[in-house]
């Protein structure tokens, strides 16, 4: 089974479409939060995720958008209320099984308080191995990680909409996991909003 992973789309529908293109054929799509901005909704991004029956979780931006602080942002008349309700109904974490592999989806960390930025060089990265899962997937930092820690593979696909990782020349990125071979591919691709050359 091929599982596609995106995170931190931040309203960039073209970035999400391009991620789906470079992933190739996938069986499941996972979104690790921050599909939107804290004060900006995207009908296009929510529609694509819903149409693809993606397994979505909230990030810190959804938490603000759907809190009292985001009430003015939610009142914009152009927002599709069915799509907003779809995104609002998502949890902040998910445990799922694909084939025989157990996946834990979080936006920042599996431990409380949520919100810590765990970069690839962080000593806290090893804490992900405490999870009862074969794969722990997270976003939040916009920085790619693929690391085996004990029996757990930790994956951060980077950002499919707001590139900030200098290690890949600030390209957008996504990931694909093959649950039969445990192969993880992180795929870089250009952000068409910023043409090169």
Annotate each predicted stretch with a short phrase.
Residues 183-197:
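A short C-terminal boundary segment appended to hydrolase-like catalytic domains
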Residues 2-10, 102-109, 153-158, 186:
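Active-site-proximal beta-strand elements of phosphoester/diester hydrolases
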Residues 92-100, 145-150:
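Short acidic-hydrophobic surface loop/beta-edge motif
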Residues 70-76, 99-132, 162-165:
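Active-site-proximal segments of metal-dependent phosphoesterases and phosphodiesterases across multiple
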Residues 119-181, 185:
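Conserved beta-sheet core of the metallophosphoesterase superfamily
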Residues 10-15, 37-40, 62-67, 111-113, ...:
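Active-site environment of divalent metal-dependent phosphoester hydrolases
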Residues 28, 55, 103, 134-135:
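Short, Asp-centered acidic motifs that coordinate Mg2+ and/or phosphate
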Residues 2-92, 96-97:
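Core catalytic region of metal-dependent phosphoesterases/phosphodiesterases
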